[in-house]
């Protein structure tokens, strides 16, 4: 799943119902007068921002969406029923544009936000509407108005919850493949990941969060070195950054490619690149994830972890995992979900009431 998901849909609101020509037929009333009712309005097409959705994949298999037309008017002053509305659930962050002109029409930014993307047509008038002093028996009615029909492009700029940082070959792609449904390319050479990947991590049937994997960062990325610069901006809306480090690379014999290069210095260089690129991105919560635990002798793990954390001067949480064998991934996933849930609860809290507008209460 790529960062920007797209889909094209056709929406059609319902046409309005036709008006009715009818006259009263009552005993002893030769000229009962008109009683044809109006047609009902056509159904609207709404879009709602659903915080439980992370992709537009459903719209790739169901392109056309039509609301019901309004009911026709009837005699005895009966109006037609309004057509049934339809509501399309879309992820938060969806941008809706006119497919023909490319003009942005709407943007769903808030959970639960509802917008009308196509309005149903008004119902036609029945002949009772045309009664006047000079026309007591009108035989005129109007058809219903057509509903709006639009071809739309849906573009999702995904709001990932968690972003992965690290040097090329740190094991970011292996991690996202281990804990999510993403299947990025994994190989033993730098910059295997050439474009961002998203993975939806499902903790429970209706509990999930989104992880974003971007190409590895190297020193000078903020000036354009490597591949990561053009994708760093996609991490600016994340709630948490995971700095994934190859723990086995501390043994220079394991990775000849980085022989003679201090992994701690490399980790510090990535942190400095964040700071140069965007101070707000640098200030985000950042957890240290030491990967490739399976390649480190069991007797050396604790000392190696303590030495790395001490030299890096990392103050936040530290996790030790093996993305290949899944060791330690479970506790990390549950800790991430708890952090994401906490942030979501804070976002949903109502703003504090301005004391100037608070009620004074009983005297």
Curated annotation (Swiss-Prot):
* Family matches, as InterPro entries: G_OBG, GTP-bd, GTP-bd_Obg/CgtA, GTP1-OBG_CS, GTP1_OBG_dom, GTP1_OBG_dom_sf, OBG_GTPase, P-loop_NTPase
Primary location: cytoplasm
The prosthetic group or cofactor this protein requires is:
Mg(2+)
Record: residues binding GTP? 166-173, 191-195, 213-216, 291-294, 322-324
Tell me the residue numbers annotated for binding Mg(2+): 173, 193
- GO molecular function list: GTP binding; GTPase activity; magnesium ion binding
Function noted in UniProt:
An essential GTPase which binds GTP, GDP and possibly (p)ppGpp with moderate affinity, with high nucleotide exchange rates and a fairly low GTP hydrolysis rate. Plays a role in control of the cell cycle, stress response, ribosome biogenesis and in those bacteria that undergo differentiation, in morphogenesis control.
Its protein name is GTPase Obg
Q: Does the keyword Nucleotide-binding apply?
A: yes
Task: Give the quaternary structure.
Answer: Monomer.
Localization of this protein: Cytoplasm
**HAMAP family in UniProt:** GTPase_Obg (MF_01454)
């Amino acid at each position: 799943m790529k960062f920007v998901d797209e889909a094209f849909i056709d929406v059609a609101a319902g046409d309005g119902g036709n008006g009715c020509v009818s006259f009263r037929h009552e005993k002893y009333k030769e000229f009962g007068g008109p009683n044809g009712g109006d047609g009902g309005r056509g159904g609207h097409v709404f879009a709602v921002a659903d915080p439980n959705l992370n992709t537009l994949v459903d719209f790739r298999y169901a392109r056309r969406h039509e609301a019901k037309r309004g009911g026709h008017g009837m005699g005895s002053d009966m109006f037609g029923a309004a057509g049934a509305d339809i509501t399309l659930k879309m992820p938060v962050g969806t941008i809706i544009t006119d497919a023909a002109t490319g003009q942005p029409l709407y943007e769903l930014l808030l959970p639960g936000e509802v917008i009308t993307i196509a309005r149903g047509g008004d119902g036609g008038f029945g002949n009772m509407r045309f009664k006047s002093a000079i026309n007591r028996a009108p035989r005129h009615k109007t058809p219903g108005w057509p509903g709006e029909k639009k071809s739309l492009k849906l573009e999702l700029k995904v709001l990932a919850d968690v972003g992965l940082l690290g040097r090329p070959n740190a094991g970011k792609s292996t991690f996202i493949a281990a804990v999510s449904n993403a299947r990025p390319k994994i190989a033993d050479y730098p910059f295997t990941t050439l474009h961002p990947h998203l993975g939806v991590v499902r903790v429970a049937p209706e509990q999930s969060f989104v992880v974003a994997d971007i190409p590895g960062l190297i020193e000078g990325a903020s000036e354009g070195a490597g591949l990561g610069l053009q994708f760093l901006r996609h991490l600016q809306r994340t709630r948490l950054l995971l700095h994934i480090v190859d723990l086995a690379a501390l043994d220079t014999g394991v990775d000849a490619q980085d022989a003679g290069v201090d992994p701690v210095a490399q980790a510090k260089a990535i942190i400095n690149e964040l700071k140069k690129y965007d101070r707000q991105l640098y200030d985000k919560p950042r957890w240290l994830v030491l990967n490739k635990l399976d390649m480190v002798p069991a007797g050396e793990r604790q000392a190696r972890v303590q030495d790395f954390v001490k030299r890096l001067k990392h103050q936040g949480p530290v996790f030790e995992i093996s993305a290949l064998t899944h060791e330690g991934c479970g506790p990390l996933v549950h800790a991430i979900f708890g952090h994401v849930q906490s942030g979501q609860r804070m976002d949903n809290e109502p703003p504090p009431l301005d004391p100037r507008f608070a009620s004074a209460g009983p005297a």
